[in-house]
Amino acid sequence: MILMLPSMFHANAWGFPYSGWMSGADMVMPGPHLQGPHLRTMIESARPTLTAMVPTLLGDLLLADETAPLDLSCFRAIVSGGSAVPSSMIEAVRDRWNVPVIQGWGMTETSPMCVLSHPPKDLNGETETYWRLKSGRPVPGIEVRVMDDEGNLLEQDGATVGELQLKGAWVTGSYLNEETDAFTEDGWLRTGDVGMVDERGYVQLTDRTKDVIKSGGEWISSVDLEDVLLKHESVAEVAVVAVDDTRWQERPLAIVRSKSGCDGEALPGELRSFLVDKVAKFWVPEYWAVVDDIPKTSVGKMDKKLLREAVAAGKLAIQKHLGFGEGND
């Protein structure tokens, strides 16, 4: 039984209405109400065995469980996509309910699934979470390659980063009545996603091309920064965007929604200290904004376009912190 939580208009609900029908699975449709209490009632009464949701909604369920215990042990797996699932979320779902989180990557143009994350039988000395954090391997029929800005093919070594491009029988080759540079001359779809592919064929997304931050000629992944920040006990949500900087061209701005009871004034300094031994030092943001809410798109992703517009319009109270663990500079 599938609990259908992706929006019906989001990449054809990730293909679940079709795969569910083809496999003969029952489907539970939640309607427009995706709040915690309504989902709790549906899960407890229907006891579905599979569901899919964006990380934002999965985070809401984890928070609901902290208020009143929620039993998700009925699920054999939870599929998540739309944006990267933080490692803290993957581990929390496993530790609380012994349920694996399976990441997927795709888009409407790929009908919609192209990559699915299942750890290999041989973990190669890594943890299971390490493999679940990856976007996964291409599903049969899909090819993936990594290209640089000049159109050169890059190595699949798990380290070299470039634009991910796709090709396959169900990958679209054009847009109706629209001229676009989204396709290469040799027929590959330019996804606009930045990432790498390792020797085993596992794809790892690091950012969207429009979201990656170039500071002093070096790339900073907003996705990776967000993943580390979410491990801090005081952070409920975080979005990282670029802001202009006279010396470095761009620097990361961390926009944080803290958990209740936290000191918003002291939090940026605490988070800088938290980051300093977990990421490269030049990745540590000096620009911070602590907010009551982070806007979402209609499919539950952080609305970074709206956040960038808010920054440009001066609507965010941005603090600059250069010290660690204390005060503004």
Regions found by a protein language model. Give the residues of each.
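AMP-binding/adenylate-forming catalytic domain of the ANL superfamily
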Residues: 277-302, 320-327
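Conserved ATP/PPi-binding loop(s) of AMP-dependent carboxylate-activating enzymes
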Residues: 134-141, 152-185, 218-220
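Conserved beta-loop-beta connector loops within the AMP-binding
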Residues: 141-165, 199-200, 262-268, 303
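Acidic/polar alpha-helix N-cap and adjacent early helical turns
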Residues: 309-329
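Conserved AMP-binding/adenylation subdomain of ANL enzymes
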Residues: 1-5, 9-49, 64
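Active-site glycine-centered loops adjacent to acidic/histidine catalytic or metal-binding residues
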Residues: 82, 106, 136, 193, ...
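Gly/Ser/Thr-rich phosphate-binding loop
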Residues: 22-25, 48-53, 62-130, 143, ...
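AMP-binding/adenylate-forming catalytic core of the ANL superfamily
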Residues: 51, 168, 173-174, 194-283, ...
